[in-house]
Swiss-Prot record:
<keyword id="KW-1278">Translocase</keyword>
<protein>
    <recommendedName>
        <fullName>NADH-ubiquinone oxidoreductase chain 4L</fullName>
        <ecNumber>7.1.1.2</ecNumber>
    </recommendedName>
</protein>
<dbReference type="InterPro" id="IPR001133">
    <property type="entry name" value="NADH_UbQ_OxRdtase_chain4L/K"/>
</dbReference>
<dbReference type="GO" id="GO:0031966">
    <property type="term" value="C:mitochondrial membrane"/>
</dbReference>
<dbReference type="Pfam" id="PF00420">
    <property type="entry name" value="Oxidored_q2"/>
</dbReference>
<feature type="transmembrane region" description="Helical">
    <location>
        <begin position="61"/>
        <end position="81"/>
    </location>
</feature>
<keyword id="KW-0830">Ubiquinone</keyword>
<keyword id="KW-0472">Membrane</keyword>
<feature type="transmembrane region" description="Helical">
    <location>
        <begin position="26"/>
        <end position="46"/>
    </location>
</feature>
<keyword id="KW-0813">Transport</keyword>
<comment type="similarity">
    <text>Belongs to the complex I subunit 4L family.</text>
</comment>
<keyword id="KW-0496">Mitochondrion</keyword>
<keyword id="KW-0249">Electron transport</keyword>
<keyword id="KW-1133">Transmembrane helix</keyword>
<dbReference type="GO" id="GO:0045271">
    <property type="term" value="C:respiratory chain complex I"/>
</dbReference>
<dbReference type="GO" id="GO:0042773">
    <property type="term" value="P:ATP synthesis coupled electron transport"/>
</dbReference>
<keyword id="KW-0679">Respiratory chain</keyword>
């Protein structure tokens, strides 16, 4: 394990702790999930380079497309929630019933 792997693992652990401590704000949750999935994709690519295997790079590309779709859906939910309630709080998601 080299220094870059350790830094990426530390960033992932910081992201998980951010998810544990920031449960109310949707924007924070989206940013933290983007950070975690981006870090996970980079770890897959680094492992793929170290093992000389293409599967990790393809997994990194799949994770990148998944995070793009996740952020688009998450931001759409945030816009709808803010237009209905005026508050961006995860506790108000039950007001989106329609």
């Amino acid at each position: 394990m080299n220094l870059i792997d350790l830094i990426l693992i530390a960033i992932y652990v910081i992201g998980i702790s951010g998810l544990i401590f920031n449960k109310n704000n949707i924007i924070n949750i989206l940013i933290i999930s983007e950070l975690n999935l981006g870090t996970l994709g980079m770890l897959f690519v680094l492992a793929s380079v170290e093992l000389n295997d293409i599967l990790g790079e393809l997994s990194g590309l799949y994770i990148l497309t998944f995070t793009a779709a996740e952020s688009a859906i998450g931001l759409a939910i945030v816009v709808i929630l803010y237009s209905k309630t005026g508050i961006i709080n995860i506790r108000h998601l039950n007001k989106l019933k329609g």
